[in-house]
Amino acid sequence: MDPSDAHLGHAQFGDTPDSGDAKTSSRVPLPEGTLPVGIGLLIAGVTSYLFLKVAKVALGSDEAVQPIASLWIATFALAPGFFLPLEQELARTLAHRRAIGQGGQPVVARVRTLGIGLAGIVTLAALAASPLIVSGYFDGDWVLMLALILAFSAYAPAHLSRGIASGNGRFRAYAIVMGADGAVRIVLCAALAILGVKTVGLYGFVVALSPLPGVLYVRARGALRTEPGPESTWAEVTPNLGWLLLGSVFAAALVNAGPLAATLLADGSVGQKRLVTRFTYGVLLARIPLFLFQAVQAALLPRLSRLAARNEIAEFRSGFMRLMKLVLLVGVVGTAGAFLLGPLVIEKFYDAELSRKTMAMLALGSALYMVALAIAQAVIALRGHALVALGWGIGAVTFVVVTWLSSDELFRRVELGLVASSITALITFALALRSRLRSGDLPSGQSVMEAINNMPLET
């Protein structure tokens, strides 16, 4: 899966109509939008695995693909971290206005201004640091630096478009924006390969521009239209945005930290570039449990949202424990599967080699991250946004320290950093959850929606 989307939550789980007393039936119908968004998510996930395969066929070797893989990872470490919270808050606010019969045009204008400002600040920071980024990460290639800036900017309208589509219940448009990104990336990459293009920079621009065709298509069809309404205030669209943004930036960086760190720590030789690319293959394969986690959410979170809205806390806790058991099961199966089958899959699909130990460590880190993410969502549901930001921040610091001090072996130090960072984040969230429960904090429908949407991953 891509360096990271998991926005089945944007199908507005909490808005599923109640069809009777919860005690009469434990079954919850699939929320509106689950099917189209699920299809878009599937397309995005499958094409993400195919992208590096097509790029390798086009460029001829693992070491030739490494700059493109590094650009791709960097893009999804930056864009979701900064823009997913805007998408989430825009969708939440528009859905609320739609429910009370108010137009959302002023809300979109507010969030658009915020997005432009955020994109501008991050772009200026990237430009200021560009000499260091180019020399330390892109091996002196300024074209890839330009592609990174363009890619980051291109994902701003993509995320805002998804927020508008989701908040207005236009889930087909949401799925088109999501799925078209991966589909366009594959088609353009394959076209360059057929033409025999070997220039890495052109493949970089494919990564940069792939989000835009889907946005332009749904805009042309009027799916991003909003109605006039009462003036929007900053308080309406940013009640928890600061903490959500901070936590999202740390979480997105952490889920992509493995390939990022491996690229920075490699010595730049052909052999090391080959190893970094193969490591990236392993990271993508190890994320399959995270992809399955989204399916688990789709099945259980609609009921949790309804229970929270009714203040049925005992049932909410029971449902959350069921979710945690499934998450743990997915994590165990994923780790065992990576150990037993991971090297074979890497060999057959990517024509590369990766050890069982490396695959198992990567899958373990991914599984622990998944558990931490599930607990973090529960903390957000209990209005612990600041605690979640703190937990992801502690995880990020742990990754840096452990990767720096633990070993001199490239893969081992990064693997240990990933596992240790997920463990510290998990422990922090578990302590925060216990604290929020003991203090008597109760979830609300809105806080659960924020929790459901809090998936800082992109496929």
Predicted features along the sequence, with ranges:
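Signature of the first transmembrane helix
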Residues: 2-7, 14, 28-87, 127, ...
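Interhelical loop/hinge segments that connect adjacent transmembrane helices in multipass membrane
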Residues: 4-5, 9, 14-30, 172-176, ...
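Membrane-water interface segments that mark the loop-to-transmembrane alpha-helix transition
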Residues: 29-44, 70-71, 80-131, 312-335
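Transmembrane helical elements of multi-pass membrane transporters/channels
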Residues: 32-52, 180-181, 185, 203-218, ...
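Short membrane-interface helical motifs at transmembrane helix boundaries
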Residues: 54-57, 121-139, 333-351
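Helix-loop junctions and terminal segments of transmembrane helices
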Residues: 83-99, 282-286, 290-311, 381
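Hydrophobic alpha-helical transmembrane segments
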Residues: 142-149, 175-224, 394-398, 411-436
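Membrane-interface junctions at transmembrane-helix termini in multi-pass inner-membrane proteins
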Residues: 154-176, 358-360, 364-391
